[in-house]
């Protein structure tokens, strides 16, 4: 596990312990029983691709550990509306407070403002967070293979699917991909960022693409900054993308999305 990921996971352990003092897991479980059915996250991506278009997971992210604050004028609801108008299939919302300046409320605000399915982008290591994600309104959760052992991957993905959510399983190298394939989640995200060096290369996706089973949907994540990047990945048969930084730095995030993915 990389140094930054080790720090984040250590913080998450403390965060979960603190949250348990205020809301028990039993209370979250009870709340889950009365919630409406999640919006289909994987289904939305697959429907877009079946229509012949690129499926974009547009990210709502105020800051990152490597780049600092990306967007000072940060209004999740307005960004969500902009993304939906720009052609996004789904949203990703950072809820990590300490490292990404996110907040649980950002997810709720974004989801309430549009009709798109929403990924809770956080560092999920415990069943408590899966129930919490469902209560917040998440339609999908992220599981980072580098942060979890095989038993955790199976248990957390199984719980999310049982609660009606989808799971995006994120990998950074071939060893992690082989582990991700062993669980039944339909979405595999290949992160082009090296967690040790923070260097980004689209070659990560291009090299590993052929190893992803045909019954899984590959999502390329990180380092997609221009329409040329999109064209390069599309030419290689990549049809689903998670993009955040490029949009967050734009004056109009949804227009940036449209220009990058839908104007040739």
Swiss-Prot record:
- What catalytic reaction does the record list? 1-(2-carboxyphenylamino)-1-deoxy-D-ribulose 5-phosphate + H(+) = (1S,2R)-1-C-(indol-3-yl)glycerol 3-phosphate + CO2 + H2O
Q: Which UniProt keywords apply?
A: Amino-acid biosynthesis, Aromatic amino acid biosynthesis, Decarboxylase, Lyase, Tryptophan biosynthesis
Q: What is its EC number?
A: 4.1.1.48
Pathway(s) of this molecule:
Amino-acid biosynthesis; L-tryptophan biosynthesis; L-tryptophan from chorismate: step 4/5
The family database entries (PROSITE patterns) matched by this protein are listed as: IGPS
Transmembrane segments annotated in the record for this chain: none
Q: Cite a single GO BP annotation.
A: L-tryptophan biosynthetic process
Please report the name of this protein according to its UniProt entry.
Answer: Indole-3-glycerol phosphate synthase
Q: Which domain of life is it from?
A: Bacteria
Q: Which family does it belong to?
A: Belongs to the TrpC family.
The record's disulfide annotation reads none
Higher taxonomy: Bacteria, Pseudomonadati, Pseudomonadota, Gammaproteobacteria, Lysobacterales
Q: Name one GO molecular function term.
A: phosphoribosylanthranilate isomerase activity
């Amino acid at each position: 596990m990389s140094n930054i990921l080790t720090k984040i996971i250590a913080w998450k352990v403390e965060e979960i312990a603190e949250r348990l003092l205020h809301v028990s897991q039993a209370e979250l479980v009870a709340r889950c029983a009365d919630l409406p059915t999640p919006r289909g996250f994987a289904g939305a991506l697959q429907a877009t691709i079946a229509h012949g278009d690129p499926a974009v997971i547009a990210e709502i992210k105020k800051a990152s550990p490597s780049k600092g604050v990306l967007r000072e004028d940060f209004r999740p609801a307005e960004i969500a509306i902009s993304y939906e108008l720009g052609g996004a299939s789904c949203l990703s919302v950072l809820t990590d407070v300490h490292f990404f300046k996110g907040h649980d409320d950002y997810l709720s605000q974004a989801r309430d403002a549009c009709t798109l399915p929403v990924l809770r982008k956080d560092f999920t290591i415990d069943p408590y967070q899966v129930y919490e994600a469902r209560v917040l309104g998440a339609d999908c959760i992220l599981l980072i293979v580098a942060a979890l052992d095989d038993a955790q991957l199976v248990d957390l993905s199984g719980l999310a699917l049982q609660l009606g959510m989808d799971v995006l399983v994120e990998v950074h190298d071939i060893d992690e991909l082989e582990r991700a394939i062993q669980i039944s989640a339909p979405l595999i995200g290949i992160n082009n960022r090296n967690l040790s060096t923070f260097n980004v290369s689209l070659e990560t996706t291009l090299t590993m693409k052929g190893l992803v089973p045909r019954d899984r949907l590959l999502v390329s994540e990180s380092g997609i900054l221009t329409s040329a990047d999109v064209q390069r990945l599309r030419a290689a048969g990549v049809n689903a993308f998670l993009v955040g930084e490029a949009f967050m730095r734009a004056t109009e995030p949804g227009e940036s999305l449209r220009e990058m993915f839908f104007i040739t």
